[in-house]
């Protein structure tokens, strides 16, 4: 099939494709968020009842929280290395199966060692999904709304956290922690069949690999635009593919700073989501009351991110990300000052926007910073290197709890980390090789006549 024979399909077809793509991607990321937060909801049970997996100290609990994140780092980096060669759709399907299997195996764990191994295994699938989803979304949605759609998809992370927290409050006593993990295995049953039918490949990626006929077929079927001639000229300036492109002079400074931003964002995200229920329980709240703080943290992230993403589309993500980091620092400091419960919950919601929500915005920032040939690698770099921060977050919280220090120390440390994140964000250089889809909205598409 010749790409020159394809004309631009009706907008309705493209709108349906975008809707399905965003829905599938959001559900996949929601279960990722569920997986990464559900551990914090069951941590008090595992620490208080040695009959579950054995005796677990605070230090061991922090390490168990980090094993999944080590897996995420490995999965993101591996998928980033191959994602710009193998495509977005194929890897998303593989990773849905992978992390679902990991959750089911974790539910059957009979020892701390087996549980740790399965958390690592699950993390590999989650990391792969996080790395490939942002690239697919960036290449399939309208350029003018990339940050908004990215925020919708990655708001699945805090939405999954809300789901994990609510289900733990409602059903943890009835189905136990193993039942909560079995819920995390459902995507292989309810999401995979849908993704097999409705999830498209990116025409932009297909063109970048020289598969013009395949790209034209996807374009004709889904309405996803082919890249413009200006896009292709821009892509030819990027001589290397994948991680090799990240080390070029064009990208190296920004890549380093974006990695630090993600490191900070994920340190805050996983430090708080792992230890907030335990800290609030130690502060005198009952089990369900302490989980309520986790619900509000993630709820604030969902709402705040959707609002912030609109500003990011209009004014650019850089200043918006720096601002949300700053909001996190302020909220965490104020959280130590003994305000009434209503004020504390409001501060937790703001902290959710500034921590979990900021990381969502960072994914959007990163996915639109790189050219197609380096996009999956760029997202994978930030998701992978950032997981080092996610690993240290729970460990830092565990060390503070083990040392018997004031809970305020935890919040002060995380507030300082947020200030660092804001400062680093402001120094990221402008992307000289950013996607030019918005700037070339009226340009002729590759293989499509301008009059089509």
PLM region descriptions:
Residues 90-104, 319-333:
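Structural signature of the two symmetry-related core transmembrane helices
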Residues 87, 108-114, 142, 338-339:
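Helix-breaking motifs and short loop linkers at transmembrane-helix boundaries and internal kinks
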């Amino acid at each position: 099939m010749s790409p020159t024979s394809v004309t631009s399909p009706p907008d309705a077809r493209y709108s349906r494709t975008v809707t399905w793509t965003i829905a599938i991607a959001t559900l996949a990321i929601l279960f990722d968020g569920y997986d990464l937060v559900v551990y914090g909801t069951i941590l008090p049970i595992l620490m208080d009842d040695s009959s579950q997996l054995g005796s677990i100290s605070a230090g061991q609990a922090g390490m168990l929280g980090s094993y999944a994140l080590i897996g995420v780092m490995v999965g993101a980096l591996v998928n980033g290395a191959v994602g710009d060669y193998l495509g977005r759709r194929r890897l998303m399907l593989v990773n849905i199966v992978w992390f679902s299997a990991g959750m089911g195996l974790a539910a059957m764990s009979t020892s701390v060692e087996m549980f740790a191994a399965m958390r690592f295994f699950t993390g590999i699938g989650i990391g792969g999904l996080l790395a490939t989803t942002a690239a697919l979304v960036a290449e399939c949605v309208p350029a003018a709304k990339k940050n908004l759609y990215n925020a919708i998809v990655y708001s699945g992370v805090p939405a999954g956290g809300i789901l994990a927290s609510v289900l733990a409050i409602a059903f943890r006593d009835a189905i136990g922690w193993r039942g909560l993990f079995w819920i995390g295995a459902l995507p292989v049953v309810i999401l995979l069949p849908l993704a097999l039918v409705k999830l498209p490949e990116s025409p932009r990626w297909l063109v970048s690999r020289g598969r013009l006929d395949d790209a034209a077929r996807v374009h004709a079927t889904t309405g996803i635009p082919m890249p413009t001639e200006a896009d292709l000229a821009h892509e030819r300036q990027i001589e290397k593919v994948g991680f090799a492109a990240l080390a070029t002079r064009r990208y190296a400074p920004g890549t380093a700073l974006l990695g630090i931003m993600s490191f900070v964002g994920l340190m805050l995200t996983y430090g708080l989501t792992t230890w907030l229920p335990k800290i609030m329980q130690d502060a005198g709240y009952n089990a369900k009351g302490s989980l309520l703080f986790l619900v509000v943290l993630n709820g604030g992230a969902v709402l705040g991110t959707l609002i912030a993403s609109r500003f990011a589309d209009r004014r650019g993500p850089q200043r918006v990300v720096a601002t949300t980091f700053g909001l996190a620092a302020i909220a965490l400091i104020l959280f130590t000052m003994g305000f009434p419960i209503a004020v504390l919950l409001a501060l937790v919601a703001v902290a959710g926007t500034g921590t979990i929500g900021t990381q969502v915005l960072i994914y959007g920032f990163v996915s639109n910073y790189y050219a197609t040939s380096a996009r999956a690698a760029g997202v994978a770099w930030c998701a992978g290197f950032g997981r080092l921060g996610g690993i240290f977050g729970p460990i830092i919280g565990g060390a503070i709890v083990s040392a018997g220090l004031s809970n305020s120390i935890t919040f002060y440390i995380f507030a300082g980390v947020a200030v660092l994140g804001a400062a680093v964000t402001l120094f990221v250089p402008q992307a000289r090789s950013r996607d030019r889809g918005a700037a070339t909205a009226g340009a002729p598409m590759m293989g499509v006549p301008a009059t089509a």
